[in-house]
Amino acid sequence: MAKFIMVVGTSSNSGKTVLVSGICRMLSNKGYKVAPFKSQNMSLNSRVSVEDGEIAVAQYTQAMAARAEPSVHFNPILLKPKGNFVSQVIVHGNPYEDKDYNEYRSKKDDFLVKIKESIDYLDKNYDYVVIEGAGSCCEINLLNDDIANLKVAEIAGADAILVSDIDRGGVFASIYGTVQLLPENWKKLLKGFVINKFRGNIDVLKDGFEKIEELTNIPVIGTIPYDETLVLPEEDSQALDGKRVFGNLKSPIEVNVVKFSKIANFTDVDPFSSDCLMKYIDFNENITGDILILPGTRCSTVEMDLMKKYGMDKKILEFVENGGIVLGICGGYQALGKMLFDEDFSEGDVGTISGLGLFDMETTFGNKKAIKNSTGKISIFNQNFDVSGYELHEGYSVSNETPLISLSKGFGNCGDSYDGSFKMIGDSYIFGTYFHGILENFEFRNYLVNLARSKKNLSKIEDDTYAELFNENMDKLSKIIEENLDFSKIIG
């Protein structure tokens, strides 16, 4: 039998995802078998579980924090927005149907059955399960249909923690208002409050702690200090709204990432951040980097249309003429080809469109989706790298270029034992792959960085700094939580 703990919030971006990650690592460090859980997540940022199913990146990252194999049971319902208020519904890792809100709500009881199946599975296989809520746990206009917050705690028999972000102001009002609006049966599940992102002397909060406990009969069990040095993966593309330049700001190598309108799996580029200066560029901006990334996207044809509209297509071709290094991942890889055929408009309103033409390749879209954990070998210029990644794509590509990866497992371009394409145009290197997570393979990542460094007569890098950075930051987060939160009333 597992002990269930739930983290709910007074609002979106209150710190639920990070807090769950830190608690998972803290409990794992104590020797417990731990699983994260989020009954329903809405995100275009997803990864592939051990069962070859699709789950949100946040739950995948939390699984890494917990040192657990990522499972579809960690995120039984995933909603992937497609536009016009319609989302693709993923159930236990597999595409179910496209539904708008009313259609989805009408199937709520069916989805609750799937959620309960996952809770039962986790109960039998783990010591602790740390549940993450969604948005505010008390949207009173949605309470009857909310299957992502305290309804889940009720089903699982979980003790709940309410977290609120003090950096926004009004933290005590947010906490009190949330508690007052909750139904009595859910209010009783709350065992403590957490104040997140606090700067300064905690003594100034003590009167507030006493007053809020007096008003609610629920204690503040801790305060998490604001720590700008923590480097943690972002949950979804909203985090990019104010994010432009990041990574190693002192690096002589600059990586530009085209900021697609429907960018997906944007964390693919994060492994570059420990060794390179990273910069997101809009369609109308100039390319200033040494390496250009065309990332994943929910709608490849839409992005191709926008690149043509704003002149980014011509800038990319000019970048190649000047010897630049280009990597396209999934939707970005598809855009590097000659044609993208979408006769059924499955990608959006654009339909069939010509691509950048850097690869002699054509992509055709359909309803069948490749969801795979994939492995293979890259063999180029007397270099051999074993690589792994994960595939999440609905198009298949026929390429006449040199394959980038010989597959040992996976679907690849079109189920033909190969993935991706590679070629040189003059002094320019062009790479494309369906492998999300390709840059987590440090040998290939360092190969790309060293290509750019060699063009500037700089020495090679050899270390796997990204993997080290992830675990260092998770352990640091775990320590912050253990030192600043009192979980004795919850985990004993």
UniProtKB/Swiss-Prot annotation:
Keyword Nucleotidyltransferase included in the entry's annotation: no
SUPFAM superfamilies assigned to the protein according to its UniProt record, in alphabetical order: Class I glutamine amidotransferase-like, P-loop containing nucleoside triphosphate hydrolases
Domain GATase cobBQ-type residues, every copy: 252-444
Active site (record annotation): 330, 436
Pfam families assigned to the protein according to its UniProt record, in alphabetical order: CbiA (PF01656), GATase_3 (PF07685)
Gene3D superfamilies: 3.40.50.880, P-loop containing nucleotide triphosphate hydrolases (3.40.50.300)
Record GO biological process: cobalamin biosynthetic process
Entry similarity comment: Belongs to the CobB/CobQ family. CobQ subfamily.
Protein name, per record: Probable cobyric acid synthase
Organism: Methanococcus maripaludis (strain DSM 14266 / JCM 13030 / NBRC 101832 / S2 / LL)
